[in-house]
Amino acid sequence: MVALSTLNMVNKNLTDTQNRVSSGLQIMSGKDNAAYFAISETMKGDSGMFESIHDGLTATKNSISTARLGSETVSDLAKEFAERVAFAQGSGVNLADVQAELDSLVTQIGTAISQSTFNGEDLVSGAAATVTVVSGISRTGGTFAATTISFQSVNLTSIQTALSNIDLTALDTGSTDAAVPDTLQEALQFAEAQLSNAIDAATSLGVTEKTIEGQMTFLDMLTDTLDSGVSAMVDANMEEEAARLQALQVQQQLATQSLSMANQAPQNIMSLFRQ
């Protein structure tokens, strides 16, 4: 009975060790360690959510990056526009020729705006609006909440519209329309104002892009930390398990031999009586 009990215990330990070696885990279910299992499963869930949020922020960053590049292009074109209007302030300048250049620049601005979308998301051509994206999760006690980042989209279309209202060949000093300059000096002021707006738009989107990148880096660090924590709780020490497996295999062989010898003992005694 002792030999059989020993063999059964060795076989059970051997099976458990083989499971740990094959899975790489020392805690595979709540049966192994309820507290560690519950904590590790929660941490795994958070890690998975962080990875999904990171993927979402990647798409957001790409949209913002595209919008920023568009804003920088519009800013460069608006700068060139203002320079041409400044040139027109001189005497003897053919305003019609300068206006043709300005019209071309306005068209280029429109093209840049139309191409500044990513995956259908437009952050540059509508009225400025607040955009909110999920940036992470927060756990306090038993409370779960999502954290967010908000930023402003920009309106480059208004810049294009304002610049298109400048017509150096049709200045009207008697005009009462505040959206249309009526002198060369006013035209330059209009152009400079829109250049400033374009620079502000590019700067705002650049700051937002940097913020998103920082949050993505932070999420990477959090995910690595959570994964390391889970590993420390549930992963098996493979060197120890391999040594234990080898020792248990030897014990199994010895226990099997002991049981075999125990089973043969009654037969040996009976053979003595036969003699």
State where each predicted segment sits:
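Amphipathic alpha-helical coiled-coil/heptad-repeat segments
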Residues: 1-2, 8-12, 22, 26-236, ...
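Short loop/turn microsegments at loop-to-beta-strand junctions
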Residues: 119, 245-246
